[in-house]
C-alpha cells in the first residue's frame, strides 16, 4: 500500500490520458520531448512559465505542426533549435535557451494530449541575473516620476487656459494715421517786402533826370582851335552825365 500511494498521481494521469513528464536543464543543453499516451500527434504547443522574459503574453501557443510533406512547421521562436527525431512529431529534440521554461503539450487527433514540464536553470520571474537589480529598479522609479510630471504639466496648462479665458480681451489697436505729405520744392527767388519795394521806388522817383553837364570852356576853346586843323570829317564828341 505504501508503494502504491506515490505512484497514484502517475496512474491517474495515464488513466485520464494526460500524462506529465518533468525535465530540467541549462541553456545549451539538449532535451527530448516525447508524446506519451498520444498515438497520432498532430501538433505541439507551449505555455511559457515566464512569458515576460521573451516578450510574450500568457497562455499556450502552437510551436510545431505536422506536415504532409514530411517536414514539420516550427514557430519562429524555436526555429533552428527544435527538430523531429522520427518521421512524425512524436519525439522532438530541443536545444535549450534562457526563457524556455514552461509546459509543452503534445496534442492528438482526438484532442488527447500529454504534457512535459521543462525547467531551465537560471530562469526567474524577473528575467534578470543575480546582482543586476539596479538596472531593473530604474524603470520602476522613472515611470512614476514621468506620470507625476505629466499630471503637473496638464494642471499648469489648465490653469493658464482658464486665466486666459476669464481675462478681458485686449483693446483693439488704434486705426493707422494718414500718411505724411511732402510739399514740392520750388526754386523761386525770394520776394522783396512791400516796404522795401516802396523805398526803392521812392528813390527812383527822387533821382534827377538826365541833363547835360556844364563843360569846361577851356576845353571847348581848345577844341575850337583844333577844329581848324582837324578835317571837317572829324566826329563831334559829346559828354553826357547821368
Curated annotation (Swiss-Prot):
This is Megakaryocyte and platelet inhibitory receptor G6b. Keywords: Cell membrane, Glycoprotein, Membrane, Phosphoprotein, Receptor, Signal, Transmembrane, Transmembrane helix. It comes from Mus musculus. Residues 1-17 form the signal peptide. It is found in: Cell membrane. Interacts (via ITIM motif) with PTPN6 and PTPN11. Binds to heparin. GO terms for biological process: blood coagulation; erythrocyte differentiation; integrin-mediated signaling pathway; megakaryocyte development; megakaryocyte differentiation; negative regulation of signal transduction; platelet formation. Inhibitory receptor that acts as a critical regulator of hematopoietic lineage differentiation, megakaryocyte function and platelet production. Inhibits platelet aggregation and activation by agonists such as ADP and collagen-related peptide. This regulation of megakaryocate function as well as platelet production ann activation is done through the inhibition (via the 2 ITIM motifs) of the receptors CLEC1B and GP6:FcRgamma signaling. Appears to operate in a calcium-independent manner. The keyword Transmembrane helix applies. Glycans are attached at residues 32, 112.
